[in-house]
Structure formats: structure tokens, C-alpha cells
Amino acid sequence: MVLGWPLLLVLVLCPGVTGIKDCVFCELTDSARCPGTHMRCGDDEDCFTGHGVAQGVGPIINKGCVHSTSCGREEPISYMGLTYSLTTTCCSGHLCNKGTGLSTGATSLSLGLQLLLGLLLLLQYWL
């Protein structure tokens, strides 16, 4: 039982293992940068990034948590007096909507950590 407490601590503190999901949140913006803040999602929610376009102007973006049934939808949204067509793209990993390319790394790291913890638990009972 030597590894018991450290493994329990990692399970409690690692969001990918416990099922806790944070997403990046930022309001609608016309800036290419959307640094945002972290927000906690509900069990039935996914992280999303919304990309909006309107004829003759630059794109808009927003991020946050959304009910999984809203993923992939395109809907009109008003921003700064213009109507944009906003498409919601969802992902299900911890902070997966943070930026391009980071979601895959974060998800891979989480899965790798889960595999490592599982192997350590198995070794604990064999030794």
C-alpha cells in the first residue's frame, strides 16, 4: 500500500482523471486573440469555440461551455450592430478550446497519465 496515497492524491488533483472539465471562456470579440478565463463545465456540457462571419467584415470568436446538443450548429448572432453567422465547434477535453494544437497535447497527456496510474495500481497488487 506504499503507492496508495500518492496515487489517490494524483487522482484527486488531475482533472482529466476525475472527470472535472474546465474550458476557456471569453465573450464575443473581433480580436484574433481570445485569452479568456477558465470556467467549470457541467457534466452534460462540452467546451466550444464559436467562429462568426459576416459579409464585408472580419471574423468574431467566443469560447466557453455549451450543452452538447448545441455542438456543430450554425446560428445568427448580433455583434456590434451586425448579424453574424456563428458556428459552434465543440471538444470534450480539459481546456481543449484553449488554442490550436494544444487540445491534442492536453488530451494525450491526460490519457497517458491515466494509463500510467492504471499500470502503477496493477503493479502495486503484484508486488
UniProtKB/Swiss-Prot annotation:
The gene is Spaca4. Residues 23-97 form the UPAR/Ly6 domain. The lineage of its organism: Eukaryota, Metazoa, Chordata, Craniata, Vertebrata. GO terms for cellular component: inner acrosomal membrane; outer acrosomal membrane; plasma membrane; side of membrane. Its main location: membrane. Residues 1-19 form the signal peptide. It is found in: Cell membrane; Cytoplasmic vesicle, Secretory vesicle, Acrosome; Cytoplasmic vesicle, Secretory vesicle, Acrosome inner membrane; Cytoplasmic vesicle, Secretory vesicle, Acrosome outer membrane. It comes from the Eukaryota. The keyword Membrane applies. Keywords: Cell adhesion, Cell membrane, Cytoplasmic vesicle, Disulfide bond, Fertilization, Glycoprotein, GPI-anchor, Lipoprotein, Membrane, Signal. Pfam families: UPAR_LY6 (PF00021). InterPro entries: LY6_UPA_recep-like, Snake_toxin-like_sf, SPACA4/Bouncer. Residues 98-127 form a propeptide. Belongs to the SPACA4/bouncer family. Disulfide bonds join 23-47, 26-34, 41-65, 71-90, 91-96. Sperm surface membrane protein that is essential for effective sperm-zona pellucida binding and penetration during fertilization. Testis specific. Expressed in spermatozoa (at protein level). GO terms for biological process: binding of sperm to zona pellucida; cell adhesion; fertilization. A lipid is attached at residue 97 (GPI-anchor amidated asparagine). SUPFAM superfamilies: Snake toxin-like (SSF57302). It is a lipid-anchor; GPI-anchor. This is Sperm acrosome membrane-associated protein 4. Disruption phenotype: Male mice are subfertile, and show defects in sperm-zona pellucida binding and penetration.
